[in-house]
Design a protein with these regions (language model features):
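Hydrophobic/aromatic beta-strand segments within beta-rich folds
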Residues: 19, 31-48, 61, 84-114
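Extracellular carbohydrate recognition and processing domains
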Residues: 71-90
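Structural alpha-beta junctions
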Residues: 67-68, 118
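Disordered, acidic Ser/Thr/Pro-rich linker "stalks" and the adjacent N-terminal cap
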Residues: 1, 6-38, 48-55, 79, ...
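Short, surface-exposed beta-strand/strand-loop-strand elements in extracellular ectodomains
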Residues: 54-67
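Residue-level detector of conserved, well-ordered beta-strand and adjacent loop positions
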Residues: 25, 62, 74-75, 100
């Protein structure tokens, strides 16, 4: 079964600690959700993924404007790990950003997004 995590969850705060050796790890279909500042306009995010076996993996970036409905704004494949990669998409206003994993044992080591709620 898939599991979702909020940026308020215990080890999820590590995604913003400037340390690529700490990470949140999930399996295919699992996701991590970040709350954005009120009325945030967003057109991209930088993410450092982590994976022990180094195999490429698919992922999705989804946005929500509230109400629990998420829309996929970016689908891609990660081939490089443990470094920040930039992902751009059409700009929109959103309240939450979600990263959905496409494989088992994939980690999110860091996320850089100025619009993250403090």
């Amino acid at each position: 079964s898939t599991q979702g995590y909020s940026s308020a969850a215990s080890d999820v705060y590590k995604r913003q600690d400037n340390n690529l050796t700490t990470f949140w790890e999930g399996n295919k279909g699992d996701y991590i959700t970040f709350t954005l500042q009120n009325g945030a306009k967003i057109d991209g995010v930088s993410i450092a993924f982590s994976r022990e076996n180094g195999l490429e993996t698919d992922f999705e970036i989804q946005l929500s404007s509230g109400g629990g409905q998420f829309l996929t704004v970016y689908s891609g494949t990660v081939k490089e790990y443990n470094k920040l990669l930039d992902f751009r998409f059409k700009g929109t206003t959103a309240s939450d950003l979600r990263i959905v994993l496409g494989s088992d044992r994939v980690g999110v080591a860091e996320i850089k997004l100025p619009q993250l709620q403090k």
